Amino acid sequence: MKLTTSVALLAAAGAQAHYTFPQTDINGQLSGEWVTIRETTNHYSHGPVTDVTSDQIRCYELNPGTPAPQIATVQAGGTVTFTVDPSIQHPGPLQFYMAKAPSGQTAATFQGTGNVWFKIYEDGPSGLGTSNITWPSSGKTEVSVKIPSCIAPGDYLLRVEHIALHSASTVGGAQFYLACAQLTVTGGTGTLNTGELVAFPGAYSATDPGILFQLYWPIPTSYTNPGPAPVSC
């Protein structure tokens, strides 16, 4: 009985160290869980994706091809916030990507396959070269990104991604926590140069320097985010 209880407690502790992104908050309007965000496979376990060649690295959908019930609307230049359940509990970078639904599709029907994704944000650590490396998103219960004001209006998938690097010193050790929100963007100028478009899977290799990474020792002096550079207006 004691052994069973101990195993259960360990499993619960493991789940608590993991996290999901279940809701959006736009202009103070908080969606319900998995209402504007496609429900992820880890909605219960909170566990990560670890295989960058898996289709799950795209949106981590529990039921691929099944959209979220609603599409959120945001003004170009506005901010989209994702809630984190319970919080970001591992060290690593936060990144956001967008992909525009082609003509004839909506954010609900668009699957985000192929070279359609462009990065709009990435962060990195401070304290490199010291024993006190910190990451901007650590401990956050919500994370936000500004939609480029020069983006073209239309329907998009917005992909939030946090890469946990605490076990990333071996291939397959990095943990990816991610989700895709369904958006309609209004009011953009359409002048954005999206630069390099990438696919998920395909954008990352398990041996990319920002994915296969020794966080603790020897103490790192640099960090290179995986994927393309973020776009800007």
Swiss-Prot record:
InterPro entries noted in UniProt: AA9, AA9_LPMO
User: Which residues, renumbered to this chain, are glycosylated?
Assistant: N132
- Per its Swiss-Prot or TrEMBL entry, what cofactor is needed? Cu(2+)
- What keywords does the record list, in alphabetical order? Carbohydrate metabolism, Cellulose degradation, Copper, Disulfide bond, Glycoprotein, Metal-binding, Monooxygenase, Oxidoreductase, Polysaccharide degradation, Secreted, Signal
Known uses: Lignocellulose is the most abundant polymeric composite on Earth and is a recalcitrant but promising renewable substrate for industrial biotechnology applications. Together with cellobiose dehydrogenases (CDHs) an enzymatic system capable of oxidative cellulose cleavage is formed, which increases the efficiency of cellulases and put LPMOs at focus of biofuel research.
Its EC number is 1.14.99.56
Question: Which GO terms are recorded in the biological process aspect for this UniProt protein?
Answer: cellulose catabolic process
Q: Which domain of life is it from?
A: Eukaryota
Gene Ontology MF terms in the entry:
metal ion binding; monooxygenase activity
- Listed disulfide bonds for this chain? C59-C180, C150-C233
Q: Does the keyword Nucleus apply?
A: no
Q: Where is the protein found, in the record's own terms? A: Secreted
Pfam families recorded: AA9
Which reactions does this protein catalyse? [(1->4)-beta-D-glucosyl]n+m + reduced acceptor + O2 = 4-dehydro-beta-D-glucosyl-[(1->4)-beta-D-glucosyl]n-1 + [(1->4)-beta-D-glucosyl]m + acceptor + H2O
Q: How is the cofactor bound?
A: Binds 1 copper ion per subunit.
Q: Which residues bind Cu(2+)?
A: H18, H90, Y177
What does the entry list as the binding residues for O2? H166, Q175
Q: GO CC terms on record?
A: extracellular region
The positions making up the signal sequence are 1-17
Concerning its family, UniProt says: Belongs to the polysaccharide monooxygenase AA9 family.
Q: According to its UniProt entry, what is the function of this protein? A: Lytic polysaccharide monooxygenase (LPMO) that depolymerizes crystalline and amorphous polysaccharides via the oxidation of scissile alpha- or beta-(1-4)-glycosidic bonds, yielding C1 and C4 oxidation products. Catalysis by LPMOs requires the reduction of the active-site copper from Cu(II) to Cu(I) by a reducing agent and H(2)O(2) or O(2) as a cosubstrate. Shows endoglucanase activity on tamarind xyloglucan, as well as on beechwood xylan when combined with phosphoric acid swollen cellulose (PASC).
Name of the protein described by the UniProt record: AA9 family lytic polysaccharide monooxygenase A
Please state the gene responsible for encoding this protein.
LPMO9A
